[in-house]
C-alpha cells in the first residue's frame, strides 16, 4: 500500500470481534484473517487475535497469539489499509508452521482481502 504508515491499535471489546466476524474473511495456511471497514474517518488500523481451545491449552493458545502478533507487527504497516479492523484467527498448525511460511500466510491473506475490497462488485 502507499502513503503514510497507519497507526495500529488493538481490538479489545467483544462487540468489535463480533462485528469483524460478519465481515469478509480469507483463510491461508495456518490463519484466517477477517477485515471490516469502519464507518469513522480515523486513519488507523485496529487488529485483534483469536486462538480457540482447538489450538490447545492456555500455553499453546498464548504462543499462537504471540506468533500472530509478531507477524501482524511485521506486516500490517506495509499491507494494511487505514480505516480497517482486522481479526487474525489461529488455525491448526500455527504453532508448528515455519516462521517464513506463517509470514507468507498473513501477507497473502491481507493482499487477498485488499484485492476483494478494490474489485468492483456486480449484482
Locations of regions flagged by a protein language model:
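Positively charged, solvent-exposed patches that mediate nucleic-acid binding
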Residues: 1-123
Amino acid at each position: 500500500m502507499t502513503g503514510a504508515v497507519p497507526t495500529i491499535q488493538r481490538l479489545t471489546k467483544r462487540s468489535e470481534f463480533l462485528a469483524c466476524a460478519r465481515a469478509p474473511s480469507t483463510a491461508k495456511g495456518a490463519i484466517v484473517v477477517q477485515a471490516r471497514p469502519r464507518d469513522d474517518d480515523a486513519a488507523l488500523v485496529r487488529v485483534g487475535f483469536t486462538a480457540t481451545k482447538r489450538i490447545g491449552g492456555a500455553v499453546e493458545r498464548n504462543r499462537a497469539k504471540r506468533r500472530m502478533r509478531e507477524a501482524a507487527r511485521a506486516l500490517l504497516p506495509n499491507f494494511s489499509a487505514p480505516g480497517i479492523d482486522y481479526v487474525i484467527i489461529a488455525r491448526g498448525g500455527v504453532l508448528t508452521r515455519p516462521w517464513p511460511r506463517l509470514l507468507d500466510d498473513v501477507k497473502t491473506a491481507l493482499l487477498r482481502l485488499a484485492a476483494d475490497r478494490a474489485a468492483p462488485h456486480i449484482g
